């Protein structure tokens, strides 16, 4: 626990959204937030409608993905039953149906699909609040193909990653590669180099303030 700070908050993907939310909460409590880093926490190129039609289209895409990836014929999707469930209930329902079809899919893969789906849904439905501090977006070139298949709106990236309307002091640092590569070499080295410089500056400012 840092007390009043200074705080350095960084996260990749959904972790970036959590870092951003923590920064807002800490600043509201009067804490000193010095650095907020979003590692390829890039919003869809346009808003994802939260409608019945969009829910059905999303699960149609998921069924195609399962057929292609696991070589399994997904049973007809019971849309009416799904629409009465939340996101966690929906993905559990579908994955249970796939398991019950008799296809042998390792439990780890099933759990990965569940958590990945829920993470993406959290990103799509998050209510972003404005932030008046400095934010650094480490931005890859694109999302990976599976993410775009699930949600085609991720194929388009705004130059500001969709953050400009919420953050006045936004710095975009291009790192190259795809979303899932952002925390691997050589891309993470670009993040590390930029962050090291920023942290060194924060440390120097702290020493200067302590000497006064």
Q: What residues fall within each predicted segment?
A:
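A hydrolase-biased, glycine/serine/histidine/acidic-enriched motif that marks catalytic-domain neighborhoods
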Residues: 1-212
């Amino acid at each position: 626990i840092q007390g009043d700070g200074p705080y350095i908050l960084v996260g990749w993907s959904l972790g970036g959204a959590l870092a951003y939310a923590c920064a807002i909460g800490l600043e509201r409590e009067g804490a000193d937030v010095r650095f907020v880093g979003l590692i390829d926490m890039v919003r869809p190129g346009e808003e994802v409608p939260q409608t019945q039609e969009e829910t059905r289209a999303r699960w149609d895409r998921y069924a195609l993905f399962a057929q292609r990836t696991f070589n399994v014929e997904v049973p007809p999707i019971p849309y009416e039953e799904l629409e009465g469930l939340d996101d966690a209930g929906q993905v559990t329902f579908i994955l249970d149906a796939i398991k019950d079809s008799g296809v042998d899919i390792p439990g780890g893969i099933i759990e990965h699909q569940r958590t990945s789906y829920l993470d993406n849904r959290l990103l799509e439905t998050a209510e972003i609040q404005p932030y008046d501090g400095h934010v650094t977006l480490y931005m890859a070139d694109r999302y990976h193909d599976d993410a775009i298949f699930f949600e085609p709106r991720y194929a388009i990236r705004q130059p500001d990653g969709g953050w400009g309307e919420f953050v006045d002091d936004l710095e975009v640092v291009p790192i190259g590669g795809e979303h899932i590569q952002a925390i691997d070499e050589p891309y993470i080295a670009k993040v590390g180099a930029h962050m090291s410089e920023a942290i060194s500056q924060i440390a120097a400012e702290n020493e200067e303030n302590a000497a006064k």
